[in-house]
A protein has these predicted regions:
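N-terminal functional module of multi-domain proteins
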Residues: 2-130
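A conserved active-site-flanking secondary-structure segment within enzyme catalytic domains
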Residues: 135-165, 201-202
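Short, structured loop/turn "capping" segments at alpha-beta junctions
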Residues: 156-160, 196-201, 212-217, 245-247
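Conserved anion/nucleotide-ligand pocket segment
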Residues: 166-205
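Short acidic/histidine-centered micro-motifs embedded in hydrophobic/aromatic stretches
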Residues: 202-209, 255
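A short, Lys/Arg-enriched amphipathic alpha-helix from helix-turn-helix/homeodomain DNA-binding modules
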Residues: 215, 220-247, 253-256, 260, ...
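Basic/polar phosphate-binding segments, predominantly the helix-turn-helix DNA-binding elements
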Residues: 240-241, 246-282, 302-327
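…primarily DNA-binding HTH/wHTH and HhH modules…
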Residues: 293, 297, 311-352
């Protein structure tokens, strides 16, 4: 530890929409130091964190997955804490409804004004953003919730491709992206307050991983379709099955009956991407699936998705995903030994 005697107090916030796996994962890692004391010289002999689950009320709380957990204390009982962490929360298709947990957001804002870190895992930043502390500060969230977040909190700059964002004048706003990026969050907190060697020891014990490549490889591109421009929606529908044809942008313009400049302007305003960028994203998304599910060569996949120049395809793929095609395949393709073991079981189930 860095000369500190008293452990840091961590308040892990539980609301009914919370993800139990994320909440308990964070809890177990930060609270497990005492159990590992003496097993690794890199770990402190005194637990660096005191972790408790807090909520609107103490007692039993039923979560979104139907399971329950015990809330150790109500926020009314917590007058000071060093760290507020909100785990993943379920965000409905209709988006995040603000104002449901005003007592929690006011409490979190008060703790932050007293010096506490505000930390979120995945979609937990929806709740913390209601404090106003993230206004004008970079943050990240699960890519699947990025549109909902942008609509709910337009004053918060969003970077869903980033795993971890540390912001604020005193670096006291910490957000992590997609679900298991809570690994990066807890490892960062351990590095910051205990040390890098301790974080490495904890990572080894729990098999936690830093997401060094960011979240861009995990993002599934779907394209905005709720913009209300019927002409653009029609073009998107056609493009979804014809993105690999030669000159797809020119064909969309021809089919739309609009002037080229008008079509491109409306398409960009509606989707947030220029037509050629939209085509590229669809092609790369199809290439990702082919890399994951087939053994086709990178050159063959390049041709299949519409690129005659495999070298250009490789450069574009890395620019969009942050990874080379071969590295992406190694990361996401089901391991050969698993496929080999699963194949006989699939065949046996297919026999009537």
């Amino acid at each position: 530890m860095t000369g500190r005697i008293q452990p840091l107090h961590v308040s892990l916030v539980a609301v009914p929409e919370a993800s139990m796996s994320t909440l308990l994962g964070i809890h177990d890692v930060l609270a497990f130091f005492s159990a590992l004391a003496g097993k690794d010289p890199a770990l402190p002999t005194v637990a660096p964190f005191t972790v408790e689950i807090v909520g609107s009320e103490r007692g039993r709380l039923r979560l979104a997955n139907g399971l329950s957990l015990d809330v150790n204390r109500s926020i009314a009982e917590v007058s000071k804490t060093d760290m507020v962490i909100v785990p993943s929360v379920v965000v409905p298709d209709t988006g995040w409804k603000t104002g449901r947990y005003t007592e929690i957001t006011r409490w979190a804002a008060r703790m932050h004004s007293q010096g506490a870190l505000l930390c979120s895992a995945c979609s937990g930043v929806f709740l913390l953003a209601e404090t106003g502390a993230f206004d004008g500060q970079q943050t990240t969230v699960h890519w699947g919730y990025s549109d909902h977040f942008a609509r709910a909190f337009p004053r918060v700059p969003l970077q869903p491709e980033r795993v971890l964002v540390v912001a604020g004048e005193r670096e006291q706003l910490v957000s992590s992206g997609a679900s298991t990026s809570w690994h990066d969050l807890v490892l960062y907190l351990i590095v910051r307050y205990v040390g890098a060697t301790a974080a490495q020891a904890i990572a080894r014990f729990f098999a936690l991983q830093w997401h060094h490549d960011g979240l861009a490889p995990y993002i599934v591109f779907e394209g905005r379709k709720d913009h209300g421009d019927a002409g653009v929606v029609e073009a998107q529908a056609w493009l979804s099955t014809h993105f690999s044809v030669a000159s797809p942008v020119e064909e969309m313009v021809r089919r739309s009956g609009m002037a080229e400049r008008t079509f491109k302007r409306r398409f960009t305003e509606a989707t947030g991407l220029a037509p050629i960028e939209y085509v590229q994203r669809l092609r790369i998304e199809d290439a990702k699936r082919r890399l994951e599910r087939t053994d086709a060569s990178v050159d063959e996949i390049s041709w299949k998705v519409g690129y005659e120049d495999p070298a250009f395809f490789r450069r574009l793929f890395k620019r969009v995903t942050g990874m080379a095609p071969g590295a992406y395949r190694r990361r996401f393709q089901v391991p050969a030994f698993v496929q080999a073991q699963a194949a006989p079981r699939r065949r046996s189930r297919a026999i009537p």
